[in-house]
Amino acid sequence: FCLSRGLGDVYKRQIFSNANTILIPDPVYPVYLDTNIMCGRKIVYMDGKPENNFLPMPDDSVKADIVYLCSPNNPTGAVYTKEQLEAWVAYALKNDAVILYDAAYEAFVDDPAIPRSIFVVEDAKKCAIELCSLSKTAGFTGTRCGYTVVPHALVRKTESGKAMELNKMWLRRQTTKFNGVPYIIQRGAEAVSY
């Protein structure tokens, strides 16, 4: 768990290779797409359409390194069930992919059967990073305050083949490139209750 400026820190993806293949839902929150285009990564679109309730599911014919999921989705509002998230976790584990799970709108989920976190799925800690923003939860829009959960169990190989916890890489990135959320915003975030 790491306090951050919100989702933008991960979208810059300084802990992933520019050679990665990215799986992105369509329609999509523009930042997912644009930051990867700026890095020169290969983009593969997942077709969200009325027939699949705007919830694309894994396609075993596509090998991705990073998968973007947002639930509730921006811009459609569609939500994944636990069973659907289990299918995505199975896909990620099979393909050694990392799921970037955007939970910015999780506070709007009021059905206890709908997961508010990908970590309700067994083994998600081995393949997922969860991002959340207080912008939606507490009306903190524009304050750049959120958090990122990078489990210690999430291990991937570096370009040289060395196994590394992404948590350690993320912490190194944060301590090098992030000076912290301003104190007054931290105090406001502390006042948020669920």
Task: Name these PLM-found stretches.
Residues 8-9, 28-32, 138:
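Conserved coil-to-alpha-helix start sites within the AMP-binding
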Residues 20, 41, 94-98, 125-126:
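A short helix->loop->beta-strand "cap" motif at the edges of active sites that frequently abuts
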Residues 27, 103-105, 133-134:
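Short strand-turn motif at the edge of the Rossmann-like AdoMet-binding core
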Residues 44, 48-119:
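Active-site phosphate-binding strand-loop segment of PLP-dependent enzymes
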Residues 121-194:
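Conserved core segment of the aminotransferase class I/II
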Residues 8, 20, 65, 126, ...:
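Conserved acidic residues
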Residues 14-36:
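Conserved PLP-anchoring active-site segment centered on the Schiff-base-forming lysine
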Residues 1-11:
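Single conserved hydrophobic/aromatic residue that forms the stacking wall/gate
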